Amino acid sequence: MKKILLLILLGIIMPNLQAQVSNEDILGTSTEGVSEETFENWLQIQSHPIDINRVDYESLSGLAILSTAQLRAFFDYRKNFGPFMSIYELQSVPELSLEILKKLAPFITCEQEINTLGRDLKLAKSWLLIRFSQTLEEKRGFSLPTKTSIVRYANSPVKNLLRYKYANPKSLSIGFTIEKDEGENNWTDFTSFHLQIQNKGILKNLIIGDYQLQMGQGLATGGGFSLGKSAETILFTRKPTLGGRPYTSTLESGFFRGVLANFQWRKWEGLGFISHVSRDANQLEPDSLGVVSVSSLQTSGFHRTTSEIADKNALLETSLGGGISYQSEFSRIGMMFQYTNFDKPILKTNKTYNQFEFAGVQNILMSFYYNYTLSFAQVFGEITRSNSGGYGAVLGAIGSLNRRWDMSLLFRKFTPDFHSFYGNAFSENTRNINETGIYWGVKFMPSRRWQWTAYVDYFYFPWYKYLVDKPRTQGFETLLKLNYQPSKVSRISGQLRLENKEENFSWKESYLENNKTKTRTITEVTPRYRWTFNSYYSNKLTSNISIQSRISGSAFKFKQQNATYGWAISQDAKWSKGAWSLAVRTAYFSTQDYDNRQYTYEQDVQYAFSFPAYYGQGWRYYSVLSYDINKNLTFWLRWSRTDYINQETVGSGLDEIPVPHRSDVKAQIRWVF
């Protein structure tokens, strides 16, 4: 009874635990270079809160919010004092500050609170979401064909999304997604479905339909949320072993389609899966024996033109595999096998940088991974070998030196002939191939108001790369970010990053031949530098109004040329009262070239995201309005517009707009029942 009274008191005193925290605050980054898949995976986690009385170490650490010491404190408290009565009880865990709990709040729930305190909530619920979006100006792809340009998009410029899900956190999840991109002919161009059953005796997890799989450090299967290198320099270094999760994203690649089963007996787990899914791919003309090959996989998901439609489902992929692991409360060791077969051989173009790329119809991966947690640190790693003989390895450690200092260290090596189609381990390259690197990150918190984070990453590429006509190139990247929180409702941050790589640089050279002046193109691999700066200020002016201000800038330079520059400034405001909420932005940007494009996170309708690259010169505006029609029905409307200065068109190719501005609208309604 005393515990319940304490929780009620905490709920009255600390109501801002459930205060709105921006995506940018949680992600801890300016979102530059963050992939669409990363955001989609993060949104899936946010839309399915975890029960703090049922969550295990791997799942909670997978949120990348709590440090090693904080994770230990959480589980020690739960072990010593029993189940949490409410999420407010988390304030009694000594290591968990209010700022940490604000970041954690969107991802957690407490069934004990529902059962004990009698909250009017349902564990099982269904929701249906419908979304429409469109660019208001006409793109060339939707105009009438001309004699010189006859290729056009197949259908209307409206993009549709229909999504349904029923979820009971204890045992069952059913859902489907139907999507059509702008210009596509079929309103069911992409469909996805899943059925998940959990916690039925030794059957821990069964998924039928579409799913992702994350084991070890993501060398073989890395289908989970991870930012890699970011302003969160410690926690994103390590990947948790999450097993299989239903796939509910609108991205049309990077998932399995079939059956996954996960069994648990005491501290042992066994997992098996099979997948049979069609992939988009570029088909080549039949060879002399009539064999049809594909040159590359297509991941855009667009099927708007004749050529894009021809690439749709051109390659059939069959995958199967399994694994076994042993897990204690804070440690895990496991092995995994994965076999992949294609119905057509993959044959890359004959380029030097493609010499070690995958070719053929099958790939086999064998993987060993481990994670061991001490009282102050975690050591982790994975070693994976493909049947080509290539291998990948990730070895790392993260830990809390004391209450003020956290540190991470990671080494990775991916040989040029290592092949993993679902890998997403920590790396500089977008794929885990042809790279060796070592990363060191640090976080220092001298007081509750101040925090600074930094990392240094050195990387080396033993073989040629695309647009790098030389083997054995190298580079480094370093970042420093300062956070200052003068009060509970305001925050100031500044971030500086420097990246150095070796890349191709081309220029024109004049020469004499037969008494005539001619020009030729000279290409040389040379160091390339890019500096970026981001600053952020947020403040809650009243209980209903908050503001955010951002300034970003960059400089880009090859060794032989003068630097080019770009910058952007934006002002946001958000108002909410009762059932209404409104967010607006005005931004100005000016960049000398595309290399200096400025990335800035934008608020969107729920379960959607936007982080466009501002480049050129102009103004950017948007507004997002939401209204709770009743407790079960919510409506969103988003409008955005970019006005460019000193240019007559926007975009290129079939996406070109013949006026210097672009406007987009998006409407969404969600019904919870």
Model-derived regions: residue spans:
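Sec-dependent N-terminal signal peptides
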Residues: I4-I13
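Boundary at the C-terminal end of the N-terminal hydrophobic targeting segment
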Residues: L17-A19
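Alpha-helical interaction/regulatory segments in DNA maintenance proteins
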Residues: T29-L43, R72, F81-P83, Y88-A124, ...
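Amphipathic, charged-and-aliphatic alpha-helical interface segments
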Residues: E37-M85, L104-F107, I178-K180
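Transmembrane beta-strand segments of Gram-negative outer membrane beta-barrel proteins
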Residues: G118-T148, Y166, K170-F176, L206, ...
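Exposed, low-structure sequence patches enriched in small/polar residues
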Residues: Y153-P157, G254-F256, A310-K348, Q355-F673
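Outer membrane beta-barrel
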Residues: G183, W187-L242, T248-D280, L401, ...
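A subset of solvent-exposed loop/turn segments in beta-rich extracellular surface proteins, enriched
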Residues: Q217, T221-T250, S278-A310, A359-N363, ...
